[in-house]
Swiss-Prot record:
One of its GO terms (biological process) is brassinosteroid homeostasis. It is found in: Membrane. GO terms for molecular function: heme binding; iron ion binding; monooxygenase activity; oxidoreductase activity, acting on paired donors, with incorporation or reduction of molecular oxygen. This is Cytochrome P450 734A2. Keywords: Growth regulation, Heme, Iron, Membrane, Metal-binding, Monooxygenase, Oxidoreductase, Transmembrane, Transmembrane helix. The keyword ATP-binding does not apply. It is an enzyme of class 1 (oxidoreductase). Its cofactor is heme. It comes from Oryza sativa subsp. japonica.
Length: 557
């Protein structure tokens, strides 16, 4: 009995000790987590403010948890509540990047802002941008985008890092060489000509001899055609079905992006979130079937006819087929023979759909709006198109390089209304820039592309005016500094698809100028705004009147 009682007491004592240790551990973990949270949400921001203040860099004060977000949201909301004034002004920076424009006037071109507890240092000097993107690029990397942003743009080339990024970039670059892109010109040209014929028929049916269309909506079909062919090549029909679903998914993700400040919103089983999840599963199943079919063809040695377009999906699959054939002989790290996993192929298809479609759509939209606003430049560009291409012939690969005026107009469009108004880099190590500024590791740098493009220090007093003539001697000589024009980024991470965007935009505008006079509609409200990319807040309704000199049934070969 005593032994039993003693055993019970011993067992109780042991249980108490375990409970005490567990409680102490729980308290320690709680205190440790609390200390880390306090450091991340309060003490680290204070240290960084002091660090940069000692270097003469200031900014709006950090507020617990929210940082500068409340002020930023208020400034952006106020700016977007009214259109541009005057309505033909191109001084869009105060509207598009209202927080940057406001705080720059107070703190100068370099200041510290807080996206919650995450600090970002603004850098707008071309020489420092050269360091960040070129001469010291190994010290910086792309920042980690928000999960909702990654859902929109995919975990493809845009968001990859290190060796994986290098492999994908090497494999995919082949698709965007000019010789390969030229093979798309007939396909894109016929698509644009069909669109023009539809607008011509609408103008005739309307009785007024002209038609109003929202080009921000209509151009999406043209750019989707091009990016589908670039991504899927001979599997175009299958790819078109997949990208139709991807377009719906983008619409849902865009709505979720607007609610990005609501914690956990993307996980809530709302009706649209459930539809989004279902679409994502179906897209993945469809792409898996397509990749499997194309992979089987690659294994059997089936290839497209010589001289056909080298599409993105084919390049990724062929890289894997080459790896299987060669057995990764020699074990070359990240050689093109290294296979790209199927999951990565899925993400690349999503990335190129978003980046390729939206970037080119926005470039085309703003270029058309600008030509409608500036009929003198529209007429100059039209005369050039007629001189080079004639009135009825679809522009060819031989024609496009000769359209110099149109090229100048595209560059000026990209300067005034760049697709991405800012870009962000993260310091991988502690870095001292050439001007002495010390950047701590993990610090994010915000490069305001639009602000640089509108800066009178580099572009002169007419920086906010539409003047394509500034690009008469090329982009590198258009400003006082060659790196004051970076619409597609800079360095090794420059947009891989920029050649496709430029080619498609130039070809589309040439065909439309052959066929229409373009005017702004009374319904057009000039209100550029940003949601990831720059776009017209209220659409872009323009009036197209068919040119009487153009044969109504001529849509090219």
């Amino acid at each position: 009995m005593e032994e039993d009682g003693g055993g019970g007491a011993g067992w109780g004592w042991a249980t108490w000790r375990v409970a005490a240790v567990a409680a102490a551990a729980a308290v320690w973990v709680t205190m440790h987590v609390a200390a880390r949270m306090a450091d991340a949400l309060w003490w680290r921001p204070r240290r960084l403010e002091a660090h940069f203040a000692a270097q003469g860099v200031r900014g709006p004060p950090y507020r617990f948890l929210l940082g500068s977000v409340r002020e930023m949201v208020a400034l952006m909301a106020e700016a977007s509540s009214k259109p541009m004034s005057p309505p033909t002004s191109h001084n869009a920076l105060p509207r598009v990047l209202a927080f940057y424009h406001y705080w720059r006037k107070i703190y100068g071109h370099r200041f510290l802002i807080w996206f919650g507890p995450t600090p970002r240092l603004t850098v707008a000097e071309p020489e420092l941008i050269r360091e960040i993107f070129l001469t010291r690029a190994d010290a910086f990397d792309r920042y980690e985008a928000h999960p909702v942003v990654r859902q929109l743009e995919g975990d493809g080339l845009v968001s990859l890092h290190g060796d994986k990024w290098a492999l994908h970039r090497r494999v995919l670059t082949d698709a965007f060489y000019p010789d390969n892109l030229n093979r798309l010109i007939p396909h894109v040209g016929k698509s644009v000509a069909a669109l023009a014929a539809k607008w011509g028929a609408m103008a005739e049916a309307g009785g007024s001899g002209e038609v109003e269309v929202d080009v921000a909506e209509w151009f999406q079909a043209v750019t989707e055609e091009a990016i589908t062919r670039a991504t899927f090549g001979r599997s175009y029909d299958d790819g078109r079905v997949v990208f139709a679903m991807q377009g719906q998914l983008m619409a849902f993700a865009s709505e979720a992006f607007r609610k990005v400040l609501v914690p956990g919103y993307r996980f809530l089983p709302t009706k649209k979130n459930r539809l989004s999840w279902r679409l994502d599963r179906e897209i993945r199943r469809s792409l898996m079937r397509l990749i499997g079919r194309r992979s089987d063809e690659a294994e059997q040695g089936e290839k497209a006819d010589d001289g056909s377009f080298r599409d993105l999906l084919g390049l990724m699959i062929n890289a894997g087929a080459a790896a299987a054939t060669r057995g990764n002989a020699g074990g070359e790290k990240n050689s093109p023979a290294a296979a790209i996993p199927v999951e990565d192929m899925l993400e690349e298809c999503k990335t190129f759909f978003f980046a390729g479609k939206q970037t080119t759509t926005n470039l085309l939209t703003w270029a058309t709006v600008l030509l409608a606003m500036h009929p003198d430049w529209q007429e100059r560009a039209r005369r050039e198109v007629f001189d080079v291409c004639g009135a009825g012939e679809l522009p060819s690969k031989e024609h496009l390089p000769k359209l110099k005026t149109l090229g100048m107009i595209m560059n000026e469009t990209l300067r005034l209304y760049p697709p991405a108004v800012a870009t962000i880099r993260r310091a991988k190590v502690d870095v001292q820039l050439s001007d002495g500024c010390m950047i701590p590791r993990d610090m994010e740098l915000l490069v305001p592309i639009m602000a640089i493009h509108h800066d009178t220090r580099y572009w002169g007093p007419d920086a906010s005016q539409f003047n394509p003539a500034r690009f008469a001697n090329g982009a590198s000589k258009a400003a006082k500094h060659p790196l004051a024009f970076i619409p597609f980024g800079l360095g090794s991470r420059m947009c891989v698809g920029q050649n496709l965007a430029r080619l498609e935009a130039k070809l589309t505008m040439a065909i439309l100028l052959q066929r229409f006079e373009i005017r702004t509609s009374p319904n057009y409200v000039h209100a550029p705004t940003v949601l990831m990319l720059l776009y017209p807040q209220y659409g872009a309704p323009l009036i197209f009147r068919p040119l009487s000199s153009h044969p109504p049934d001529s849509t090219g070969p």
